[in-house]
Amino acid sequence: MKIARGMRSGARDVGQDVEKVADTGVLYTRDMTATATLAPVFSNILEMIGNTPMLELKRFNVGPCRLFVKMECLNPGNSIKDRIAVTMIDAAEKSGKLRAGGRIVEATAGNTGLALALIAGQKGYRLTVVMPDKMSDEKISHLRAMGAEVILTRSDVAKGHPEYYQDIAERIAREDPDAFFVNQFANPANVQAHYETTAPEIWAQLDGKIDAFVAGVGSGGTVSGMGRYFKERNPACEIVLADPVGSILAPLVNEKKTVAPGSWLVEGIGEDFIPSILDMTLIDKAYAITDAESFEVARELLKLEGVLAGSSVGTLLAAALKYCREQTTPKIVVTLICDNGAKYLSKMFNDFWMVDNGFIARPTYGDIRDLIARRHLEREDFCLTPSVPIAQAIKRMRMYSVSQMAVLDEHDHVVGILDESDVLLALVRDRDCSRSPVRDFMSSRVETVKPTASVQDLIPVFRADRVAVVADAKHFYGLITRIDLINYLRKQL
């Protein structure tokens, strides 16, 4: 198979030490002793959108197939949404819907918002992004760092509810005469971006040899634009939908029936309605993928192939792997690395988050030690010694986002607890106490419960506004707080 190579258009002269040979894009040193393909130099970050490389995944079981991924995470905004954002804004400018200094408003799971923030920053627009509250903290912080106004709304309501994120964005734009509501779910430029850029790139990179394309539906632009392009050139190319369990789309494709929407944690794909730009007739089959499988496959992708990708990529890859393993003849299968996984480090790449949400099973004891979020014997918790300065203790509590820490002596026995109220009292009493040791401010009265205690034994501890120290004569096992008990009871529902 021919693999396309070459420099992007607009590359600048890199100096006299190298020269470009013919039009191959390969640069040679003057003495011809070494070769290198150099990336071009751009004058604006928006010029870097598109023309992303492809990678063949070699370490997964793909049956008789070959599986390629388009590395859309390498766009400057770290996602495939850069493509649609620049196309939709260009179209709005040309039509006069967006004027200089205007306001861009969009409902997004985050990546479209980040792409729009990139463009707004370069072109001088204001940006308001409305997001469901299940999205990662990294996305929210990233958007705000780029100057966007972020409005969080409920993720547990469907279209038509006054707090549904798309309806809120539309209302905000309607009330501001200078605002342009992007509305990626109904914007034809969304489809155009993939039909004119993403799909042709893949077609050229794989020399037109594509038997199946696997994608998810967030707004519908990817499936509609790329699916149409591939079907026009190869009617036998199968368009495969990767859909989270809880979305209404997979049942609609496979069973031709409409189901009530559920909930899912994967971000960016799956829907509780059919976006108007989505051409369902292009989809040949669908796979419904659980959150657990999506997260597991995304984590495997990092371990096996070194690709740090987002949660929706786990869904796409899980579906692609199922498709590949079902085949009896060799096929070329393509899917997407939609975004970079750095935005999910606090979620699916965080073992504690995975445990809290039931996606990783820890060894169990069958007693209240199973309620401990961070186990001391496994070095998961954060502790202090009595001599640590109070300023250092405050720094650690902030760094680790904890409200209390156990204070241990040299024998690993709990001699006290330092919590937020202790710190507050210390600062109120003496503003110059930063160098004073923790022992001067910690609570020496600790509520110790044995591992054999019952859940009911924890209630008096919490009523006394204390934290439970789980320990016996041999070991300190960890702390149990109110939220730990709440999480435990939540999992029993």
Predicted features by range, described:
Residues 7-15:
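Short polybasic linear motifs
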Residues 20-371:
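PLP-dependent amino-acid enzyme catalytic core
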Residues 120, 202, 306, 397, ...:
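Terminal peptide-recognition signature
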Residues 134-137, 380-381, 390, 414:
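Short glycine/proline-centered loop/turn elements that form peptide/ligand docking sites
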Residues 282, 366-382, 388, 435-446:
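Bateman (tandem CBS) regulatory domains
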Residues 383-401, 408-409, 427, 447-466, ...:
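The conserved cystathionine-beta-synthase
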Residues 416-423, 468, 478-485:
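Short hydrophobic beta-strand motif reused across regulatory alpha/beta modules
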